[in-house]
A protein has these predicted regions:
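Amphipathic alpha-helical segments enriched in hydrophobic/aromatic residues interleaved with Lys/Arg
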Residues: 102-143
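A general boundary/transition motif marking the beginning of the first structured unit of a protein
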Residues: 12, 91, 116-117
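N-terminal regulatory/effector-sensing and dimerization cores
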Residues: 16, 20-111
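A short, N-terminal "cap"/entry segment at the start of jelly-roll beta-barrel domains
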Residues: 1-20, 135-136
Length: 143
């Protein structure tokens, strides 16, 4: 049996810069744990470390599993929740800034395809989120 946990940090003041990390964390969820329906005011990438869950944006629901990633766009209503059996564990990074949308255009994410299925680069996404988490410094407060 595993023990659920949540560790997250966020910047208390958003600055008008080209790209800024807003929050970063990781969480092992209970069965059917849900966020939303809700709207974020920043971009938010989740990488599924283990388990399964669902991401709903508009009328589309995506079933996700370990190795997959999903992107929450700002000002868009979404819901995401852990599967009843084998609930997910994920890492995330939230970011904002004037160049955020331009940078995302260089990725495989798009409003029409807000998920990336398990790829050889999936572990790179996870590793980069963990690097950001490890480098959080003193500007973040525990959320």
């Amino acid at each position: 049996m595993y023990e659920k946990y949540k560790n997250s940090y966020k910047v208390t003041e958003k600055e008008l810069v080209s790209l800024s990390v807003y929050n970063v964390g990781f969480q092992r969820c209970d069965s059917l744990y849900q966020w939303g329906p809700g709207i974020r005011d920043h971009y938010l990438i989740h990488y599924i470390i283990s388990g399964k869950g669902f991401y709903r944006i508009g009328k589309r629901t995506y079933e996700l599993q370990a190795g997959d990633s999903f992107l929450v766009y700002p000002n868009t209503e979404v819901v995401y929740y852990a599967a009843e059996t084998d609930p997910w564990e994920y890492a995330w990074v939230g970011f904002t800034g004037s160049d955020a949308s331009m940078i995302l255009k260089a990725t495989d994410f798009s409003p029409e395809k807000p998920i990336i299925r398990e790829t050889p680069h999936g572990s790179d996404i996870h590793r980069q989120i963990l690097h950001i988490y490890d480098a959080r410094g003193n500007e973040f407060e525990h959320a």
